[in-house]
Amino acid sequence: MAFTEQEIHKLNQQFKGIPPEEIISWAIQYAENPLVTTNFRPYEVAILHAVTDVAPKIPVVWCDTGYNTPNTYKHAEELIARLHLNVKLYVPKQTSSHRDAVMGIPGIDDPRHQLFTEQVKLEPFRRAMEEHKPDVWFTNLRQGQTALRDSLDILSLSRDGVLKVSPFYHFNDSQLDAYLKDRNLPNEHKYFDPTKVLENRECGLHT
């Protein structure tokens, strides 16, 4: 399933305003090895519900940094059980307790922050992608989250040529709230990403 940038641009124009479920069904139809990634942050339930409603057995890759809030872990367990998620868990090679003893969580201005991000997020993510080798990657990127994400669209290509599909790209928080309410889906806002710290920073997965 290979598309040129020109084809992707044309498809993005066609998909604007199309329900997420239809975009997902289109992508699943052409995908040979799709997956969806999640960190169970706020509104992740939308992409997980929508994708697994179309493809119930799709691999759900969760790269757990080890630094999630108790609320996030409880939320994750609730969604895994409720949506019957086929979770593939990836964790850092070093435990958070070990890292806390020798490094802690460096601030974003600390030179060690890049190494910290590599250890807890980027390396586990690369390992997951190398093992699954997806051709379609469902994610919940949305316009307005960061400057980089504002430059993307519903469909985009990763640096490795994987087709990223963000069916809720044009949804704002109010629209997602309505989506969740209509489907009686839970949300959780007590979330912290130590690799980003600030809401408008990128962690490196989508750069």
Task: Annotate each language-model stretch with its function.
Residues M1-T207:
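Nucleotide-activated chemistry modules centered on ATP-dependent adenylation/adenylyltransferase
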